[in-house]
Amino acid sequence: MLYDQRSHGRSGRSSRENATIDRLGEDLRRVIEEVVPDGPVLLVGHSMGGMSVVAFAEQYPHLFHDRVAGAALISTTAGGLDVGRLLLPVVPAKIGLPLARGTVATLARRAGTVDGLRRAGRSLATVATDLFAFGDQVPASYVEFVDRMLSETPFEVVAGFFPSFGALDKFHAVDVLSDVPSLVMCGTADRVTSIGHSRKLHARIRNSRLVELEGAGHMVILERHEQINTELDRLIEDVLEQEGTR
């Protein structure tokens, strides 16, 4: 079952005070209750989806015994995300985050104008998408798909969630994933949630399996979709095997 995060895709727009990673963890719990009320579930989260799984683990650790039978965290993190370096890569890290926060807050007050400029500068935006989303050369259709998806996300939504990315600090919560088969995957050329984040998650989640996809970028689920599917199939087999021993 797939769903759009709040304020994304076909889901309704969230109020700004509820645009947080913690709220996304609560949303995940609600989706499970409404859509899969009984039986084991396997959680798979990419990027902000992975952060949602981490927040869910912090809020509802008991469900990793009662309901959650396995988890996959793909190109994500539980904290330490340098959003200042991400938005302002040429600025020293110590001043990058304050500048980035100020820049995003200022632009958020003119979100409509920003969205207009994004549409007007589609060629530049497409180049930026290719740079940040992918590592190796990929078909143009992949870049166009991601660029279209990003351009359909209003800047006001980006600005609303931005503070939550910098404040994320939940590595202490991921140990509960050690109780179920867990998979951590990331491309070695990820420029958003770099491979170091996945290595740290793997180190904190006992018995987890780490898969590093050489040369792949942040959108590894597109760039290396066949490998991703193979690893997820293997995780499902591990989950079914463990469920069979209960």
Locations of the language-model features?
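Active-site loop/turn elements of alpha/beta-hydrolase fold enzymes
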Residues: 3-7, 76, 215
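Short beta-strand immediately N-terminal to the catalytic nucleophile in serine-hydrolase-like folds
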Residues: 43-45, 74, 185
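Conserved alpha/beta-hydrolase "acid-adjacent" motif
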Residues: 191-197
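Catalytic active-site module of serine/aspartate enzymes centered on a nucleophile-bearing elbow/loop
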Residues: 206-246
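Short beta-strand/loop motif that positions the catalytic acidic residue
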Residues: 177-178, 184-186, 190
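Flexible "cap/lid" loop of the alpha/beta hydrolase fold
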Residues: 62, 66-113
